[in-house]
A protein has these predicted regions:
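N-terminal helical capping/dimerization or prosegment-like subdomains
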Residues: 1-55
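Conserved active-site and cofactor/substrate-binding residues in soluble primary-metabolism enzymes
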Residues: 2, 6, 10, 83, ...
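Short alpha-helix boundary/capping segments
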Residues: 20-21, 73-80, 169-177
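Broad gene-expression machinery/nucleic-acid interaction feature
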Residues: 32, 98, 154-156
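Active-site metal-coordination/substrate-binding segment of hydrolases
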Residues: 43-102
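Acidic/histidine-rich catalytic neighborhood of metal-dependent amide-processing enzymes
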Residues: 81-150
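Midchain, well-structured core segments that form catalytic/ion-binding scaffolds
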Residues: 121-193
């Protein structure tokens, strides 16, 4: 992250051959692009990333070799998520209408100059899609055993609860803010998102 060994360039060449107009979007040190082929109907976007996490130990094949053995492709990023992006390109070549791809080089790292910045650009240029397919791999036990309909995000919040300090000898004069906070936390935990 964010190096992609030329993966975005390969994609850009392939998408231009399919009639896509490509806009390169560099934010900081991060290369991203938005590719669009306008057409009738709703706007469908495929979103993904070309960066990978460091390979770590224990590889049976070179992590950056892209070896194929018994119909299985071995290499860092083959599943997360260059395989998904290859499926996007295959689908985009067959899907009629208004299709785009949002490709970022900053998903595995800090993720501040990738999708968030490209979405801001898309908003500014009137290119927010009606639908988006994110090809991030998800599974319970075996790749492809589940399909998720959304991606859970995260929320950071500061909750302030007022109390009243007091002496241990006079607990009836004190208000413990933690005790007041517990029902609010229970309500938040019970709320289905």
């Amino acid at each position: 992250t964010p190096a992609d060994a030329g993966a975005q360039e390969v994609l850009i060449v392939a998408l231009r051959k399919l009639g896509f107009e490509v806009t390169r979007l560099r934010f900081g040190e991060i290369e991203n692009f938005f590719a669009e082929r306008k057409g009738p109907g709703k706007h469908l976007c495929f979103a993904g990333h070309t960066d990978v996490v460091p390979p770590g130990e224990g590889w049976s094949h070179g992590p950056f070799d892209g070896d194929e053995q018994d119909g299985v492709l071995y290499g860092r990023g083959a599943v997360d998520m260059k395989g998904g992006i290859a499926a996007f390109v295959a689908a985009a070549s067959r899907v009629p209408g208004h299709v785009s791809l949002l490709i970022t080089g900053d998903e595995e790292g800090e993720a501040v100059d990738g999708t968030v910045r490209v979405l801001d650009w898309m908003q500014e240029h009137g290119k927010i899609p009606d639908f988006c397919v994110v090809g991030e791999p998800t599974s319970k036990a075996v790749l492809g055993d589940v399909v998720k309909v959304g991606r859970r995000g995260s929320l950071n919040a500061v909750i302030t609860m007022q109390g009243r300090q007091g002496h241990a000898a006079y607990p009836h004069l004190a208000e413990n803010a933690v005790h007041k906070l517990l029902p609010a936390l229970a309500a938040l935990a019970a709320h289905r998102l």
